[in-house]
Amino acid sequence: MPCTWITSDLQLRLILTLFFVAECLSAGMEGTKTSNNSMQQLDNGNHSSVSTTSSTERKQSTVTLYAEVKTSLSVLVDTKAVLTCPPVLWPSVLVVTWEIVLRDKPPCFGAYRRDTNQTTRGNCTDKRITWASRPDENPALQVDPVAITHDGNYTCQIVTSDGNFHHEYHLQVLVPPEVTLIQTEKGTAVCKAAAGKPAAQISWTPEGDCDTEQGPYWGDGTVTVQSTCRWGSRHVLNVSCSVSHLAGNKSLSIQLSQGAEIPAHLKNLYITAPIFIILIVVGSIWLLKISGCRKCKLKKTEHTPVVQEDEMEPYASYTEKNNPLYDITNRVKTSQVLQSEVDGMNLHTIYVPRV
């Protein structure tokens, strides 16, 4: 790539040099011819010699004419830019060249030669940079669409029979930033102008205690600016963020949920109140648990004798089931006692014990 650029550059400069030499030779020949005519006319009369010499001086001074103009041009990204050459009389044009120097790229050349009606390009690979129309009609340059990478210098040089004319453009590509406005949990407002070129400026309405920071530049030349604003104890409900930029101004508004930041004593109250409530609940549960355990212990102590009596009942039942003769003997004795009582009452009853 560097070799190609050097070769193209040398070719273009060689063309220009040839035209300059040809122009100078032409001017020299005209001067010599005029001088000879002047010498012949000098013999015929002094007045004619003075007139011819003055005409030659005017011609030579016109050939050495040199004009240069510099212009700074700002163009919005993704639009069309047309760069024009210096206004000159077209019949006198010999060569038109464009030199393009972009950021981090080698120079690019484009040329048009009028006598042969030919165009050449050297090291120009960007197809978005072209002639605006036919170079034999209008040698203006066109960039469509404009990208961030088109930042740089564009120079049009026209070589004419009357002299050289330069017009240099310093092209700056503008990128509008993306503007956002939000409210944080701390009661502050944050306005951000992201990925703008060049850096944007941020202002607030109403004014407050604001802190504006500019981030680092990205590889494409864009930068982000962020402003954080707070209003302290002032009762502010609505705020506006205004972003000023060469690509256009923008303003956003937001309604704050709280006009001022929460005081310190209220913050402490909001923190300690939940903790205090949790302690009360935990303490109440602990007290209820202790009182419940005490009641359980008292109930167990009161029911202890009953439990012992109940524990004896299975043994008694076991004795009864395993000693049926003991039960019959008791029934016989009971029957005899009842019989004696009946006899005492003069009642005769026949009792038959059950076997």
UniProtKB/Swiss-Prot annotation:
Keyword Membrane: yes
Domain annotation Ig-like C2-type: ranges: 139-257
Transmembrane helix in keyword set: yes
Any one GO molecular-function label of the UniProt entry: signaling receptor activity
Keywords assigned by UniProt, alphabetized: Cell membrane, Disulfide bond, Glycoprotein, Membrane, Receptor, Signal, Transmembrane, Transmembrane helix
SMART domains linked to this entry: IG
Extracellular side: 27-267
Gene3D superfamilies assigned: Immunoglobulins
Positions of transmembrane segments: 268-288
BP GO annotations: regulation of neuroinflammatory response
Pfam families for this protein: C2-set_2, V-set
Residue ranges that the UniProt entry lists as topological domain Cytoplasmic: 289-355
Polar residues: bias regions: 35-55
Signal peptide boundaries: 1-26
Xref: InterPro entries: CD200R (IPR040012), CD80_C2-set (IPR013162), Ig-like_dom (IPR007110), Ig-like_dom_sf (IPR036179), Ig-like_fold (IPR013783), Ig_sub (IPR003599), Ig_V-set (IPR013106)
SUPFAM superfamilies: Immunoglobulin
Location of this chain's protein in the cell: Cell membrane
Any one of the GO CC terms: external side of plasma membrane
Glycosylation, residue list: 46, 123, 153
Residues covered by region (Disordered): 35-56
Similarity-based family: Belongs to the CD200R family.
Protein name, UniProt field: Cell surface glycoprotein CD200 receptor 1
Protein source organism: Bos taurus
Gene name of the encoded protein: CD200R1
